[in-house]
Amino acid sequence: MAINTSIPIKLNKGKDAVIISPYVEKWMVKSPAQNDSSQSYYGLGLPLSFIKTLKNNKWSIQSTLILRVNTESFNQKRVLQTGGQILLTYKASENFTYQFGLYANDELFGLFILPRIGIDWIINNRTNLFGLLPGNLNFEYRMSNYFYSGFMQYFFIIKYKI
């Protein structure tokens, strides 16, 4: 179960933005190794992003500070994790944008660094391919103005303090 939202605040006549994206989540895990007993894990997060469009409007840079807690109990010590991400975005055309960057997080086991690559491709007026790897990749087909279908691949890269 997860609840999240993104609150964009436009700046500089809409060219730049601050985005606040708080979330809360709860995971239930059942393990056959432990007689199918279930365990709950909780996550709270507050990503704060700033997007700056560069002079020629084809390039932009996004910097994100991420504060989060992933744990089975909020009574534990050292549950706050701090991290961040830098993404460069290049708009090759009206229909094709790609991204590359770096994610880093102060994990419970030490510094975790992950390269990122993304795509946002409007293949035609009904079909899109978009995502940021590793993380997610989406293929979307618009059947009508109200119905969409497609595929989504979500890669779990979440760690919890136990």
Language-model segments: residues:
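Transmembrane beta-barrel domains of Gram-negative outer membranes and organellar outer membranes
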Residues: 1-72
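Residues that define the transmembrane beta-barrel architecture of outer-membrane proteins
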Residues: 1-3, 38-44, 76-82, 111-115, ...
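Residues on the lipid-exposed face of transmembrane beta-strands in outer-membrane beta-barrel proteins
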Residues: 3-9, 44-52, 84-90, 102, ...
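Outer-membrane beta-barrel translocator/channel fold
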Residues: 10, 22-44, 133-162
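Repeated loop/turn-to-beta-strand initiation elements of outer-membrane beta-barrel proteins
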Residues: 12-18, 56-61, 95-100, 126-129, ...
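Transmembrane beta-strands of outer-membrane beta-barrel pores
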Residues: 22-30, 52-54, 67-73, 104-108, ...
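Flexible, solvent-exposed coil segments and beta strand-coil junctions
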Residues: 25-30, 62-67, 94-98, 112-122, ...
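Hydrophobic alpha-helical segments and helix pairs
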Residues: 53-101
